[in-house]
Amino acid sequence: MSKWKFPQYATMTFIAMLLLAGCAPQQQVSQQKYDALDTEYQQLNRTMSKEVAANQMQITRLQNAIKVTVNSELLFPSGGWQMSAEAQQTIGKIIPILAPNQKSKINVNGYTDNVPIGPELMRQGITSNLVLSQKRAETVMQFMISQGVNPKLVSAQGLGEADPVASNDTPQGRAQNRRVELTVAGSGN
């Protein structure tokens, strides 16, 4: 039995070395993705500094993603879902930073406050805040696609009054809850 110990230990050591060597490139790729995401985050803050300073937009660095939160007032008229020219210009400045290599998945989520839909919107087929938020998210997604973003890499979801970021008891809180969030996973994902 003792004559088999050396080859066993040698084999196990060799396998362990191979496994460790295989981890190094993965760590390097992960660091490259993190660095690319950090660069995008910094670019967004520089490019959108006016909107961020005016509290129209918030840019958040997550662990493996960037989230851009845009107040609905910047994008849509009250109760509406068609983007203004200013909104198109704003989203147009974000697109080259969020989707430079057309490899990153972009999720567009629409949110509303909890104020019930009025009769005018009901006549237009908007039966709930969920439907309104879906239309808004889809409008932003369609605009992004019209600007060259790969349709396979962008999705839209309306979440209505779910996940409020502020109290719906005040006009300021309701304004904060009416938003669109664009979340992009790390570059190259």
Provide a role label for each language-model segment.
Residues L18-G22:
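C-terminal motif of bacterial Sec signal peptides marking the signal peptidase cleavage site
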Residues Y111-N189:
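Periplasmic OmpA-like peptidoglycan-binding domain that tethers envelope proteins to the cell wall
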Residues S2-T13:
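Bacterial N-terminal signal peptides that target proteins for export
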Residues V52-A54, Q63-A65, T69-N71, K93, ...:
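Extracytoplasmic
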Residues A24-Q27:
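Bacterial signal peptide processing site
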Residues Q63-G92, D113-T127:
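Short, solvent-exposed beta-strand/turn patches at coil↔beta or beta↔helix junctions
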Residues R46-A54, G79-G110, N114-P116, M141-I145, ...:
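Periplasmic peptidoglycan-binding/anchoring modules of Gram-negative envelope and division proteins
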Residues V29-T60:
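Post-signal peptide N-terminal segment of mature Sec-exported envelope proteins
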